[in-house]
């Protein structure tokens, strides 16, 4: 749908901003700034100016959230005018401060930001990208990786949030409608978002670096002047994940996976040290695989990241404003995994199975296996991303709420696929009981009527379902390489069959667990540990 060919060769387009154009309209009664907040802002400005990354990270991850809880739980941080004179009108710090300011508004203010604030936030991002992208040499700015990830993630989130806000015409005043439809057509425009993310990827040469690393070469050789700096390199990497998310929100799942091609999705890398980034990547990759009917790849993606979350949750449980998002995405991935296991049964790790049992997913999985379409729909609507339309409603559209149109479209696409497979779990359950089974007998089981009442049409319908079973159980499965789109056709069913005249011949293809290899590895590991302990003596 959207690819690199859509963008101008000169790269990033500069969206100017007249600072006096919009009055930040948040209704914030004046109150004196607390002394702790003043000291924090002055010190924060100082460490950013001096590039003390460790201290910046400490202030960003710990002090800022703590002060937000203490003084600004349900109100905005001090305005730009109140802060600027404290930091000697440091323009770069003010851009970074306003990024946190508007992020706080989106996260904490119950009624949400006003239209003016949404526009101001967009122009502030423009100022930031105008500062780092058109530069002829790398800017002297160092920020911790967690901030860079959350900056890109928030940029995409605010685009998504604005697209939904823009589609909700029923609660807008005439003035807001005029501002949205006539005066701000480029604000949070999809091409602008893609333009920024692709420009960051291009400037950092992150794809070349990832390909060089995969080939065993030094990424520095191809990084270029900008890509050698951690600031640009990590922004480029996180922008790839941002593009994955944007294309998923638009329903372009092929492009979502394709944009990650330099990244070996199923392998850990030096870039996977930000838990929220790794979890978000797996969520959108797994969802894209599911919508492309690549259930084996989706199950492997979800199972792998859910195991990672189980084992590392204590490491990040008290970090970052994104913890609520991580917890929600974890719950969503269990729902998506349950859907995939119903549509494409296969063995998964026992600890994941245990969670599915403990949280009562099995009851709903049983309903889905019995063809309960409403349960499928409920699971999908809860677990899917908040889809958006790339374009606003037309200016002459009736005043209505269009925000659910994108979700309803994707839900209908998914439910069409489910309806095609509705009879397959029942067919599978009967086939597993036999090695040979007459077509007439299976048709009788399926329709719950005596065999002598089965007509030709019933047999034809059954043959259609059996052909569907063969087709749906054959999927492309990733085997190796950096492209998540490539793979080999494999049968995902634990049984196979062929039809000879009026008889179905069934073979169980389930591979038994090889416990011997597991114990051999553990014994060898124990012997190695024993040798090391003896050497210490």
From Swiss-Prot:
Subcellular location: Cytoplasm
One Gene Ontology cellular component: eukaryotic translation initiation factor 3 complex
Record key words, sorted: Cytoplasm, Initiation factor, Protein biosynthesis
Location (main, coarse): cytoplasm
Biological processes per GO annotation: formation of cytoplasmic translation initiation complex
Every PCI domain range: 301-513
One GO MF term attached to the UniProt entry: translation initiation factor activity
InterPro entries assigned: eIF3l, PCI_dom, TPR-like_helical_dom_sf
Subunit structure: Component of the eukaryotic translation initiation factor 3 (eIF-3) complex.
PANTHER family: EUKARYOTIC TRANSLATION INITIATION FACTOR 3, EUKARYOTIC TRANSLATION INITIATION FACTOR 3 SUBUNIT L
Free-text function comment from the UniProt entry: Component of the eukaryotic translation initiation factor 3 (eIF-3) complex, which is involved in protein synthesis of a specialized repertoire of mRNAs and, together with other initiation factors, stimulates binding of mRNA and methionyl-tRNAi to the 40S ribosome. The eIF-3 complex specifically targets and initiates translation of a subset of mRNAs involved in cell proliferation.
Family affiliation: Belongs to the eIF-3 subunit L family.
Family matches, as HAMAP family: eIF3l
Protein name from the UniProt record: Eukaryotic translation initiation factor 3 subunit L
Organism: Aedes aegypti
Source organism phylogeny: Eukaryota, Metazoa, Ecdysozoa, Arthropoda, Hexapoda
